[in-house]
Regions:
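Short, positively charged, Gly/Tyr-enriched micro-motifs
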Residues: 55-148
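Short, conserved DNA-binding cores of transcription-related domains
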Residues: 1-81, 87
């Protein structure tokens, strides 16, 4: 099971996996010891604070999988900028991995969003009809931008 999550990022370290009745909770963190300040380019190892981010991933055995990632906030001593480390397998504000979003979009492109929601929920993917519509709109918008 651990190899499944190594595909997300080679820097992802699994701390423990909790198996609930309806979901897997994967506690993890990034193994990078330092970060590069996006403002000044300085190499930073000073951690300002941490928080846990809950991100849904592809289901395993029809159970929902949640990654509980300890995300660090770095403090640049050179320019006094505080920022959060980025996760390469999800966007900044998303609660789902990129590969899960791809699966949702591929599933919903040929059927209605209501049918898609029902089908995905049966597979262990927690998603609402309105979210499916939002993902489809974002995908269409991105395709239009790349065509220009």
């Amino acid at each position: 099971m651990r190899s499944t999550f190594k595909q997300l990022s080679p820097n992802l370290m699994i701390d423990k996996i909790d198996d609930n009745d309806d979901a897997f909770y994967v506690h993890c963190h990034l193994k990078n010891k330092f970060s590069i300040c996006p403002k000044c380019g300085n190499k930073i190892s000073s951690i300002h604070s941490m928080h846990t981010r809950k991100i849904q991933d592809l289901p395993i055995q029809c159970k929902t999988v949640f990654l509980l990632v300890n995300v660090r906030h770095f403090n640049c001593r050179k320019c006094k900028y505080i920022y959060t480390e980025e996760l390469e397998f999800t966007s900044k504000t998303s609660h789902k991995t990129k590969r899960l979003l791809d699966l949702i979009l591929n599933n919903s492109c040929s059927i209605s969003s209501i049918t898609s929601q029902y089908s995905l929920n049966k597979q262990g993917i927690m998603v609402k009809k309105s979210a499916i519509c939002t993902y489809q709109k974002k995908k269409i918008f991105q395709q239009l931008i790349f065509q220009i």
